[in-house]
Structures are given as structure tokens and as C-alpha cells.
């Protein structure tokens, strides 16, 4: 616990703590000021158009060519879109749900709604229609922006249950000629055309709307994590969002010359944090991919300087590296292993705050230019200055590997309810086991029961759809996460309080820690550790189909598909070797004693994961109860009746016999 003379704002925060706290940490005592003249996102856009109007704001790849959008263009498109909404009857406090891929038009719709004194609400584009329904209903949206036919069809299929919806705005009309006569549908181009006409009739309306807003107004709705059910509508003000972006820039250097690659769903608070909270305040370039299938190639072409992604993204990148190195010749593998050894030696000394010798610095530079730089170039990370990971705790192994390869990786901790960030690593003060220190003007405390609570100007206004379910008490946000503070004043996130496992001998086990160690293998896509009150630890594993399939082909193992491959004896042998490797570094009571390779992947469409790829543990335990019970018997296999989903979306029941493997 920090001692001495506390800043007044820290004292006030601690005095308002709703319960006794065990310890606390706080961020830098520096002012984070939101300029009164530019205290909303649309006002920032107007400022950027005036001050850096001819600079590139956005870049989008179309037909293989990067298209440039200046800040003046950006403002003009938002202005026409906003006035077009008003011409169609959009009113103050109206809500608009946004469903689509990362495109400039998504940003236009978001900022246009704000400029019209409304509230945008981004939802994940891979939601099924039945998952979209409660989100749209709970948000009270009267307007919906859809990117294309796929999203439009979803909304039209549930429209009878959405009587409040007045218009659906569609960007891409490819294949939609038969929809032309539907009065509910209107194109983005038509909305902008109406906006241009209204702008000529009322030339001061747009600026008048902007000037009537302030930092206290609701900027957007954002979805909560949704690990326990339907995600909630989190209300965030402009002050919440802008404070977080400006506070981040106090401890992370960002300039107008940065390139950010936007490829994670814009519905995720992390992406909105970068594109709006940081992009608009800093003025850096935001780049969009051409199609989801071209993300990897487009990322390499952009070579971003800033990148933010959840652990799954970084794990997939590293799995690609691991598989390619495994396929390389002996000499290349030897050189790579030597380079990694040098990298690990250096970063481990950095983590401990120890000096690196001149010889090791030279060896590290050599390893970087000969081995790591070409690899990072292939991944699109050669120019990276700041790489952030958040949304979940990244594996220590992945973190060390990325840092060893020369990626300036930093862990972020936060929730949607605190506008995305409350803690992160600082340059020169990084630890793979922690989430760093609080942002400026932010206090983090640990309660007596071990829960992480936070207080800062970025804490949400509340839940729009469930005001009675408030996780904020006297300005303190209750996270539901278990944590502690280490000797360096870093926050250590253990796991979700509800997920921490207590074994029969009283040992506390963090499922997330063990799961991350398992997923460091390129052959394990997902893992779930089981279970509270049981005599020993077991696991349900999902194979990484692409990597295991390649391994099977290289070893002449025939298979017909995921289900068949997952149950091969040879694959179980492969997975057992992974489990044994993880067990080597675990105390006896924490070792994984049994595992099963599930016949299918955990899937957000089956509601087994959230859209940010977090496990819905309660649902999984209920759905696979028979499987879990079998893991705690002497059974060597189990016959299970489950469900599979085909590529065309149809479902079918399937009876599958799954092996249970004991690890001695």
C-alpha cells in the first residue's frame, strides 16, 4: 500500500469507498483536462477538419487500392449523414444500432447520430438474429444501420418484434434489388443526399446541434461482456470516453503520424477507445481492411505503429510462427532457437529491473535483424511502437515471446464500464504477470474479499436497460474480478471471483492461468479447466483445427473433419504431451489429471462464448454436465448426444463417442 502524503483526489476517493479495503494503488497525479470547446467527439472532428483538414484521417482499401479520406472529407460525410437522419425524423435522444464490419461508414453513422443529439450503439456483426433481438429491444433503438444484405436479412427476420424501429439504413446494396420497394430500407447515399439538401436549407443546423452538447451528455451505449447472459447497455458519457483517451496519452506517447489498423469489431469498447477516444483527440490515421478475408495481407501492407487486440489475436499470430518454425529446416530452427534464447534472457532481466550487458545488447540487436525483424514484417508488426492486449489476461508465455521478439507489448486491464482502461504497463516498467499501474487520476482498490474496484472520471453513468443492476457504488466500479497488488505497485488480476476454483484440499486454482498455459501450444485453440470442489483438476480441450490438421497430414493420419480428427488416438497423444508440459511447472494439487478433446469448438453462435471470445462457464457446465461427471469416474470414454452446426447454418444432433485421457 502506498503511504505518505496522498493527493487530495486520492483521499477523497478512499474516503468514499463503500467498504473496507485491503490495499490500493493510484495513477499519476497529473491533470487530464478536456478542452471545453472540444468536449464531444463531433466537436473534435470539427476541430480536426479546421486545423489538419487536408491530412489523412481514414484509409480504406477498395479493389486492392488504398483510398484516402481527409479530415475535411470525414467531417463532410458525418455532417451530411447527421442532417440526413434529421431530415428522416431522427430526434434528440434517439438510439441507432450499428451492425457491420469496420468501414468508414460505420464511423460516419456513429458520429452522425451523436451530432444529431442521439446515441449510437454498436453490436457485434456476427450475432445471430435471435441474439440481436434483445440488444436492439433493450437499447430502445428506433434506427438501425446495416452494412449489407446479410445484416439486413437478420434485422428483417425479427422486425415484427421491433415495432419501434422506423428505418433501416443500408450501406451495401449488392444483391438486394428485390428489396428496393421496401419502405423500411434506405441507402446511406440517399441519407447523405437528404442531408445535403437540408444543409442548404438550414446551413447552421449542424454546428448549432454540436454547440448545444457537452461532455456530460451520453456519447454512446456499449455492450458489457455478457459472460453471464445477454450483454447490458452500458451508458458512457463524452467525459468518460475522452478522459480515458487523454489519460492514456499522458503515459503512452501518441502522435498525429501514427497508423492504427482497425480490424477488431467496432462494437468492442477497445476498438472504440482507439478509433474515437484516441484517434479523434490525437488525429492519427485509422486504416480499414478490404474484406475480413484479407485482414492479414492488409495488416502487412499498413504496418501499423499502434495495435490493440485481445489475447486470441496475439496467440493466433504466435501459433502461425510456431507452426512455420516447426516445419523449417534444422539450421533455421537452430538459429531461431538461439535468437529466442537471447530474447528471453534479455526480457527476463528487464522484467526484474536488471541491467543487460553490452554483449547481450549486441546479441539482441543481431537476433532482431537476422531473425525477428523478417518474422515481424511477415506479421505486419515491423513498425509497431505500442502493442496493447486487453479484454482478458494474456498468457505469460505469449507475453514473454512477443517481448522477446521485439514487440513492445503492454497488458491493459479494464472493463466496458470504465470506458475500456483502468490499468496498463508503462515503458520500462513491464511485468508479464501483472496489468501494470492505474491511469492518471485513477484509483484501484482491493476489497477484503479480494475484489478489484476502481474509481475514475471514466466510470460509466450506469446501465440503460437495467438501472437496478448497478455495479457502481458511490462512484466505485465493482469488477467481479479477484486481484492483488504486488511489491512494485502493479495490479495482478487473478481471475473472475466466481470462476476461481477451490479444490477439496483447499487449494485455490485460477482456471484462466492454467487455460492460458495450455493455449500456448499451437495445437490447443481453447481450454476450460474444471471444477469447484472436485478432488483433482481436469480440462475440456478444443483442438486448433488448422494446426492439428496440418500436423496430421504431415504424419499421414487420415481424417474426415473436425469431429473425426478431435477423437484420433494420435491427437490425444499430442494433447497429452501438451498437458504434461504444462504440468511440469505446477504444484502437485494443481496438475491436470484428466482431459477430454471435445468433438466441436466452443462457439459464440452456440452461446458457449461471448463475442469477445470469453467462456460462458455456467452454460458450458450445464450443457456438458455428463461429460464433466465422466471425467471424475473411472470411465475411459463417454457416449454423448450433442449438436453440430453446418456451414450453411443448419443444425443436427449427433451421437459421438469421446475418449477420456488420464495423465499419470
Predicted regions mapped to residue ranges:
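Conserved AMP-binding/adenylate-forming core of the ANL superfamily
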Residues: 37, 46, 57-111, 128-133, ...
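Conserved pre-ATP/AMP-binding loop-to-beta segment of ANL
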Residues: 53-56, 186, 192, 196-223, ...
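Conserved AMP-binding A3 loop
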Residues: 68-72, 189, 211, 219-244
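Conserved ATP-dependent adenylate/AMP-binding module captured primarily in the ANL superfamily
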Residues: 127-160, 244-261, 292-306, 378
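ANL superfamily adenylate-forming
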Residues: 150-213, 321-374
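Conserved AMP-binding/adenylation subdomain of ANL enzymes
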Residues: 242-259, 266-373, 383
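Conserved ATP-binding/catalytic segment of the ANL
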Residues: 438-503, 531
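Conserved C-terminal "lid"/linker of ANL adenylate-forming enzymes
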Residues: 501, 526-528, 533-535, 551, ...
Amino acid at each position: 500500500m502506498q503511504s505518505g502524503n496522498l493527493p487530495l483526489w486520492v483521499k477523497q476517493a478512499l474516503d468514499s469507498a463503500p467498504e473496507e479495503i485491503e490495499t490500493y494503488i493510484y495513477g499519476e497525479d497529473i491533470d487530464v483536462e478536456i478542452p471545453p470547446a472540444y468536449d464531444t467527439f463531433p466537436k473534435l472532428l470539427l476541430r480536426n477538419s479546421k486545423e489538419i483538414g487536408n491530412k489523412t484521417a481514414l484509409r480504406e482499401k477498395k479493389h486492392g487500392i488504398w483510398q484516402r479520406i481527409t479530415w475535411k472529407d470525414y467531417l463532410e460525410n458525418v455532417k451530411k449523414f447527421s442532417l440526413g437522419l434529421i431530415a428522416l425524423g431522427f430526434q434528440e435522444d434517439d438510439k441507432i444500432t450499428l451492425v457491420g464490419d469496420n468501414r468508414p461508414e460505420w464511423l460516419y453513422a456513429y458520429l452522425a447520430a451523436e451530432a444529431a443529439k442521439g446515441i449510437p450503439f454498436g453490436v457485434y456483426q456476427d450475432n445471430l438474429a435471435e441474439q440481436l433481438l434483445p440488444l436492439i429491444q433493450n437499447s430502445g433503438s428506433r434506427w438501425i444501420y446495416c452494412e449489407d444484405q446479410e445484416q439486413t436479412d437478420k434485422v428483417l427476420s425479427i422486425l415484427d418484434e421491433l415495432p419501434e424501429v422506423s428505418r433501416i439504413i443500408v450501406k451495401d446494396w449488392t444483391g438486394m434489388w428485390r428489396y428496393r420497394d421496401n419502405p423500411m430500407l434506405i441507402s446511406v447515399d440517399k441519407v447523405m443526399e437528404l442531408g445535403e439538401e437540408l444543409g442548404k436549407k438550414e446551413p447552421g443546423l449542424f454546428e448549432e446541434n454540436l454547440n448545444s452538447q457537452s461532455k456530460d451528455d451520453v456519447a454512446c451505449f456499449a455492450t458489457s461482456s455478457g459472460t453471464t447472459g445477454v450483454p447490458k447497455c452500458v451508458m458512457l458519457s463524452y467525459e468518460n470516453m475522452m478522459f480515458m483517451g487523454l489519460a492514456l496519452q499522458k503515459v503512452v506517447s501518441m502522435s498525429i503520424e501514427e497508423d492504427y489498423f482497425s480490424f477488431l469489431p467496432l462494437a468492442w469498447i477497445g476498438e472504440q477507445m482507439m478509433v474515437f477516444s484516441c484517434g479523434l483527440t490525437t488525429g492519427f490515421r485509422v486504416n480499414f481492411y478490404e474484406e475480413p478475408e484479407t485482414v492479414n495481407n492488409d495488416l502487412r501492407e499498413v504496418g501499423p505503429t499502434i495495435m490493440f487486440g485481445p489475447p486470441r489475436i496475439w496467440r493466433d499470430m504466435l501459433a502461425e510462427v510456431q507452426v512455420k518454425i516447426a516445419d523449417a529446416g534444422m539450421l533455421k530452427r537452430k538459429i531461431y532457437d538461439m535468437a529466442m534464447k537471447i530474447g528471453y534472457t534479455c526480457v527476463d532481466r528487464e522484467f526484474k529491473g536488471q541491467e543487460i550487458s553490452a554483449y547481450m545488447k549486441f546479441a539482441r540487436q543481431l537476433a532482431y535483424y537476422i531473425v525477428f525483424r523478417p518474422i515481424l514484417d511477415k506479421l505486419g508488426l515491423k513498425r509497431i511502437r505500442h502493442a496493447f492486449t486487453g479484454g482478458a489476461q494474456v498468457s505469460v508465455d505469449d507475453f514473454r515471446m512477443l517481448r522477446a521478439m521485439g514487440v513492445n507489448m503492454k497488458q491493459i486491464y479494464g472493463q466496458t464500464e470504465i470506458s475500456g482502461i483502468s490499468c496498463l504497463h508503462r515503458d520500462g516498467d513491464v511485468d508479464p504477470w501483472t496489468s501494470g499501474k492505474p491511469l492518471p487520476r485513477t484509483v484501484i482498490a482491493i476489497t477484503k474479499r479480494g475484489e478489484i474496484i476502481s474509481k475514475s472520471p471514466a466510470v460509466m453513468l450506469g446501465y440503460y436497460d437495467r438501472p437496478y443492476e448497478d455495479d457502481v457504488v458511490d462512484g466505485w466500479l465493482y469488477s467481479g474480478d479477484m486481484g492483488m497488488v504486488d511489491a512494485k505497485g502493479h495490479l495482478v488480476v487473478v481471475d473472475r471471483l466466481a470462476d476461481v476454483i477451490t479444490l477439496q484440499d483447499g487449494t485455490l486454482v485460477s482456471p484462466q492461468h492454467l487455460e492460458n498455459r495450455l493455449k500456448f501450444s499451437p495445437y490447443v485453440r481453447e481450454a476450460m479447466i474444471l471444477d469447484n470442489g472436485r478432488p483433482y483438476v481436469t480440462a475440456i480441450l478444443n483442438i486448433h483445427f488448422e494446426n492439428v490438421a496440418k500436423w496430421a497430414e504431415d504424419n499421414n493420419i487420415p481424417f474426415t473433419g473436425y469431429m473425426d480428427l478431435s477423437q484420433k488416438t494420435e491427437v490425444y497423444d499430442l494433447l497429452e504431451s501438451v498437458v504434461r508440459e504444462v504440468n511440469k511447472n505446477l504444484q502437485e494439487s494443481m496438475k491436470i489429471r484428466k482431459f477430454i478433446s471435445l468433438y466441436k469448438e466452443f462457439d459464440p453462435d452456440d452461446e458457449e462464448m461471448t463475442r469477445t471470445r470469453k467462456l460462458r462457464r455456467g452454460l458450458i457446465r450445464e450443457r456438458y454436465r455428463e461429460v464433466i461427471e465422466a471425467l471424475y469416474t473411472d470411465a475411459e470414454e463417454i457416449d454423448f448426444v450433442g449438436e453440430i452446426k453446418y456451414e450453411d447454418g443448419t443444425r443436427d444432433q449427433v451421437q459421438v463417442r469421446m475418449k477420456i485421457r488420464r495423465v499419470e
